[in-house]
From Swiss-Prot:
The keyword Magnesium does not apply. The gene is SCL16. Residues 1-202 form the GRAS domain. Expressed in seedlings, leaves and flowers. Probable transcription factor involved in plant development. Residues 1-26 are annotated as: VHIID. This is Putative scarecrow-like protein 16. It is found in: Nucleus. Residues 187-202 are annotated as: SAW. Residues 45-82 are annotated as: Leucine repeat II (LRII). Residues 92-184 are annotated as: PFYRE. InterPro entries: TF_GRAS. The lineage of its organism: Eukaryota, Viridiplantae, Streptophyta, Embryophyta, Tracheophyta. Belongs to the GRAS family.
Length: 202
């Protein structure tokens, strides 16, 4: 969890100053493919825990959940951020952690991934972090996609074998997620294929 560390850092750097306000917005996707939170708790419960923790560190915090869909390029999230009033000295920080590859890029009329990035840039954020896996699952050539999948997926399988006990709940969840990805890349096409990793060269 990175947010408690951020809250601690804010609290330690702002001694004897008015408490800062941290606004955290998360997306709740209605898509069935989106993996469940690793913590096994709802966003509502997570938000409550984070707000309570922030209070103990003298940091004011707002936690908001926005319903948005990857299939339309997270347009409702962008719209909400666009209409939110900004106060003086407020910084917008966007963390795109392991989510960009879920946004479709194969629609003929427009590339929703490019549209999302352009609209995000138009918001003029102070910081944007973009983290995603480096592999090519977007090829229309099935053999090329299968080769990329094989070259990439042995790593998480090997990791599970080394670090997770066979039969453990965590390993079952981990392997189910990997199996779903393999099935999605191999057996799905078009809008049904939501795993669209791209290599960093793109």
């Amino acid at each position: 969890m990175q947010i408690p560390t951020l809250i601690d850092s804010m609290a330690n750097k702002l001694h004897k100053k008015p408490p800062p306000l941290l606004k955290l917005t998360v997306i709740a996707s209605d898509a069935e493919f989106h993996p469940p939170p690793l913590l096994g708790i709802s966003y509502e419960e997570l938000g409550s825990k984070l707000v309570n923790f922030a209070t103990t560190r003298n940091v004011a915090m707002e936690f908001r959940i926005i319903s948005s869909s990857y299939s339309d390029g997270l347009s409702s999230l962008i719209e909400q951020l666009r209409i939110d009033p900004f106060v003086f000295n407020e910084a917008l920080v966007v963390n795109c952690h392991m989510m960009l590859h879920y946004i479709p890029d194969e629609i003929l009329t427009s590339n929703l991934r490019s549209v999302f990035l352009k609209e995000l840039r138009d918001l003029n954020p102070t910081i944007v972090t973009l983290i995603d896996e480096d592999s090519d699952f977007t090829s229309t050539n099935f053999i090329s996609r299968l080769r990329s999948l094989y070259n990439y997926m042995w790593i998480p399988y090997d990791t599970a074998e080394m670090f997770l006990t066979r039969g453990s709940e965590q390993r079952q969840w981990y392997e189910a997620d990997i199996s779903w990805k393999i099935d999605n890349v191999v057996a799905k096409e078009g809008a049904e294929r939501v795993e669209r990793l791209e290599p960093k060269s793109r």
